[in-house]
Amino acid sequence: MKNYIEIVDVYARQILDSRCNPTVEVEVELEDGTVGVAAVPSGASTGAFEAVELRDGDKSQYLGKGVLKAVDNVNTTIADELVGMNVLDQVAIDKTMIELDGTDNKAKLGANAMLGVSLACAKAAANSLGMSLYQYIGGVNGKVLPVPMMNIINGGKHADNNVDLQEFMIMPAGAPSFSEALRMCSEVYHALKSTLKAQGYDTGVGDEGGFAPNLKSNEEAIVVIIEAIKKAGYTPGKDIFIALDPASSEIFEDGKYNLAGEGRVLTPEEMANYYVELAEKYPIISIEDGMAEEDWDGWKILTEKIGNKVQLVGDDLFVTNTERLSKGIKLGVANSILIKLNQIGTLTETLNAIEMAERAGYTAVVSHRSGETEDTTIADLVVAVNAGQIKTGAPARSERVAKYNQLLRIEEELNDMGEYRGLKAFYNINK
């Protein structure tokens, strides 16, 4: 195997994401003519501690959301340093960009610029070596197909309705394989559409492909999903489980949680009890961002109440950042981390966060963003690191389906070597 393959060109362009906003795409070319291409996603509900996504701010172009500054940073500052480097040395590539940026939050070059380059380098390296991306990142041990955490009802910032909680998801942890899990979710998705239609609800979809009906309450969203699971011929709590992403930072005001759609304002203790009641009533296996990103006391209360039986995922809380994750581990809050590549800005730092989580007994859920592209890197990443869970939207909208289709290809390639862990993927809770 080659041990040095020189980077000869690094080039970025501005493209569009699934929300019709500009984003960065990067091409990295190697001395043997091989090319790696990566496109960067973007979030709607972003954590305050995420790495900076560099936008132009010119209101006359794309309402100020252009990324030409980030593109220029790739084509000049970053390219000047990386051309001539060994594409196989991912750590050195990412370290070089981090040092070039020189800030704690990627504010100078932009996490969108740096991530595009980081991922394009990994893809170019894999292509040059004739390997799949998951094999290149994970080596011989990358073989676990993930349980999908599939968003099928949208609320909060992802939809224009009166549902406060942002995402209501299904997890087919009872499926025997990834392909069967995908089939089950697809059937529930269709059953949900017909259920909503029969009840007179709109079946338009939100940013991530989930339906966005104007339901009467958050609990009604769970009820119609349970109904759809049964209608599709599956058993809630055995075949398919429920997962929630309240995105609580978005409803946290003056130390309390404002459930405006239900006309209630709750203290952190009351909010924790709200989740306890839901988890006792319904087969809820995972809750993401149940408390706000700076409500560490609220997180502690929630973790003490149900952290032994419900996966509690930190997204805005941890932002794929080892410093914040380390604090959470020391305080004993949450038991899982959501992994979003663009929250931290390089592949190396992402892998470090996953490793830290797993060493502490926390699960890692690899995730998309609401503003996505056709890029399928996260599908390869989740298999490479054996994370066992992926969150990448409904089985609708091609930028979501692209990830699922890539996982089907990987499952086929792995054949008997592949493993779908189902409930065993939740090693952080008592099942």
From Swiss-Prot:
Cofactor dependency: Mg(2+)
Binding positions (Mg(2+)): 245, 288, 315
Gene: eno
GO BP annotations listed: glycolytic process
Molecular function (Gene Ontology), one example: phosphopyruvate hydratase activity
Active site, UniProt feature: 208, 340
Presence of the UniProt keyword Transferase in the record: no
Protein name as it appears in the record: Enolase
Tree of life domain: Bacteria
Entry EC no(s): 4.2.1.11
Cofactor annotation comment: Binds a second Mg(2+) ion via substrate during catalysis.
EC main group: lyase
Chief place where the protein resides: cytoplasm
GO cellular component: cell surface; extracellular region; phosphopyruvate hydratase complex
Gene3D superfamilies, sorted: Enolase-like C-terminal domain, Enolase-like, N-terminal domain
